[in-house]
Design a protein with these regions (language model features):
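Transmembrane alpha-helical segments of polytopic membrane transport and secretion proteins
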Residues: 1-19, 284-293
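Transmembrane-helix boundary motif in ABC transporter permease subunits
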Residues: 3, 77-109, 130, 284-290
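Periplasmic/extracellular loop-to-transmembrane helix junction in inner-membrane transport proteins
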Residues: 2-9, 13, 34-78, 98-99, ...
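Interhelical loop and adjacent transmembrane-helix boundary motif
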Residues: 134, 139, 224-274
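Transmembrane alpha-helices
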Residues: 111, 164-168, 184, 190-228
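C-terminal transmembrane helix and the adjacent membrane-cytosol boundary/short C-terminal tail
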Residues: 169-177, 184, 254-293
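Membrane-embedded alpha-helices of multi-pass transport/permease systems
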Residues: 27-31, 83-91, 108, 119-122, ...
């Protein structure tokens, strides 16, 4: 009996230490990125770095506004496309589809969610970019190469749809069947039950799923690097090229680091991305607590 108690205590202490180590690792990452960013922060005002649009490292101009705008445009467009599609797919597969259909869709979603991002990038380069250039852009502008915010948003949305559908399906499955049956027994239609019972009960989990998808979208590198155009400009529309922060880091780190402050500028870009993801997750936790109340 004493051995079992001791074993439980040791297991609890080990799990506690692992939890502390995980939190400490995040803190180390943040501190490390901040220290590496300190040279550029000591020479330029933070507000100027965030609001200037000129990116000319050779001339000592480090404006991060184009990269922040590009990241925001691609992420927002991807979520706007993926969220309604994923939600409707999950509702159909959970509430309406036959069990045999779900049997085949589940493995397919897992496969799509696990595909390397470079495959999505190649697909976007071969299909989405020419489609935007030849069929969409001519309706609104005189010329577009196709390497645009729209192409990046479409590719990113396709990447996160399998993830969102899988998460939504698991969340909907966890809603008690008793609640569904009680709603139906009171005369509600199936859609009314879904709208007023299932979706309302699943709201906290859905918020967490969207934040997870946002985090993946913000950190995506290879796919956006291949389809967004990588021009350091502030996009005026979805048919302009953009340069998200992950693409900036992947495209330039290891090159031109002899330029003064270039290494520090890229580390500051990484710190910005880290900060945005952390704030996003903390904000989602606050929203979840409010929703649960």
């Amino acid at each position: 009996m004493d051995y079992r108690i001791a074993k439980d205590k040791i297991a609890g202490q080990v799990m506690f230490l692992l939890t502390i180590a995980s939190i400490f690792l995040v803190i180390i990452m943040a501190v490390g990125l901040f220290i590496k960013s300190e040279p550029i922060l000591s020479q330029y005002h933070l507000w100027d770095l965030l609001t200037e649009s000129n990116w000319r490292p050779m001339e000592g101009k480090f404006g991060f506004l184009p990269f922040l705008a590009g990241t925001f445009w691609c992420t927002a467009l991807a979520i706007l496309i993926a969220l309604p599609i994923s939600l409707l797919m999950a509702i159909y597969l959970t509430e309406y589809a036959h069990r045999s259909i779900r049997k085949y869709v589940y493995p397919l979603l897992d496969i799509l969610a696990g595909l390397p991002s470079v495959i999505y990038g190649v697909w976007g380069t071969l299909l989405i970019v020419p489609w935007v250039s030849k069929h969409v852009a001519p309706l609104f502008v005189e010329f577009s190469s196709g390497y645009t915010v729209l192409a990046g948003g479409i590719v990113l949305s396709v990447m996160i749809i399998p993830l969102l559908v899988s998460l939504f399906m698991e969340i909907f499955d966890n809603v008690s069947k008793d609640l569904r049956e009680a709603s139906l027994s009171l005369g509600a239609t199936q859609w009314q039950t879904i709208k007023h019972v299932v979706l309302r009960k699943a709201r906290p989990g859905m918020i967490a799923a969207v934040v997870l998808a946002l985090s993946r979208t913000l950190g995506e590198t290879i796919a956006v690097l291949m389809v967004c155009g990588n021009l350091a400009i502030v996009p005026g529309s979805v048919l302009d090229a953009c340069y998200p922060i992950p693409a900036l880091i992947a495209n330039n780190y290891g090159e031109m680091l002899s330029v003064p402050l270039y290494d520090s500028a890229l580390m500051f870009a990484a710190f910005l991305l880290f900060f945005v993801v952390v704030i996003l997750n903390l904000g989602s936790r606050i929203v979840l607590l409010k929703v649960k109340e």
